[in-house]
Amino acid sequence: AKSQNNITLSVDVEKIPEMGFVISYLKESMIGMDFDAKGHAEYRIEDMDAIYLTLHNGFAEQKTIYAEKGDHIQLSFDGESMKKTLKMEGVRENIADYLKNVKISWPANKDFALDIKDFVKLLKEKVKENQQLLDSLTPALTKESSKFVKLEKNRIKYMLGLSLLDYPRMHPYMAKIEYTPGDDYYNELKAWLEEDLNSLCLSQYRTLMTEVPTFIMSRKTPIRTPYEKAMKQMEYINNNTKDEQVKQNLLTIIANNYIKDAGIQKSTELDAFYRKHVTDKELLAQYQQTYDSWAAVSPGQPAPDFKAVDISDKEFSLKDFKGKYVCLYLWPCVSPA
């Protein structure tokens, strides 16, 4: 059901896609849609005011759509080709058309041979170039969402800004010189960023706001483990972010992502740091939910019960595996995005 507090996505297909139908948003969120016997699936996104969603029809097709809190977007297609049969209801039509037509022009490899000052100058020109379509459509887009226009400007800016993270690796290769980033490089990194609470729904912004601290903190002392990386990121953000809401959100993003990836077994220092510096009740609740989900499956805890059906329709549950070894057959898949 539609709710003013979340974003709801409904999908109806004539035939369930053979390679699955997945939605992704942000960097860490990729959800496979679970269709019922009638070919219907539904998913709700909470705690997001606005979001860019990518629809993945297996590995063959992708489509980006935009949604805001309170939206109920209904999609339908034949289950084989989104391009030929996709119908959408509940989307903002002008924004949907813009996202269908916008193409991002990136710096060429040879551009990385420029010194950092000239490279940043070129990046800023690229940002303006890539915002031209948006600028030309701003009146029509603003009628549908004033929030989208500003958000899209920032999405383009931070998308191009990701090239700054590649510069230390690409510059010596393209310029055919030895190169160690100096103060000029790190100053440009910092200058590209702005503390903006509204941009936290952008994966590009999140990446830069969390990875730039990694670059800065590893300048003198190498960071060797994911745990060291998370701690250094949180330390830098806590000491250098002025906007308290932005700070606490970034700390939550880092802590949540680390716990999701690595669990809670070796997170005592991170957990204490997080709880000391984050006071927002909603953010604490998000983190606690992630923490508790891992605590439930940590070593020594009873295995959660489940029910599953094999290819012969025989039902299994946890008790059927008591005292037995279980072979897990995993398919390592990668996101095509």
Task: Name what the model sees in each region.
Residues 153-216:
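Extended amphipathic alpha-helical segments with heptad-repeat/coiled-coil character used for oligomerization
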Residues 3-151, 164-166, 173:
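A non-transmembrane, solvent-exposed segment enriched in polar/low-complexity residues
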Residues 171-192, 226-237, 264-276, 288, ...:
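Alpha-helical repeat scaffolds
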Residues 322-323, 327-337:
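Conserved redox-active cysteine motifs that mediate thiol-disulfide chemistry
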Residues 245-310, 319-321:
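N-proximal helix/coil linker or "cap" segments that precede and/or mark the start of modular domains
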Residues 119-125, 166-178, 216-225, 257-265:
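Short coil/turn connectors between adjacent alpha-helices in alpha-solenoid helical repeat scaffolds
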Residues 145-155, 246, 283:
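Structural signature of alpha-solenoid helical repeat junctions
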Residues 199-259:
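Long, charge-rich alpha-helical interaction segments
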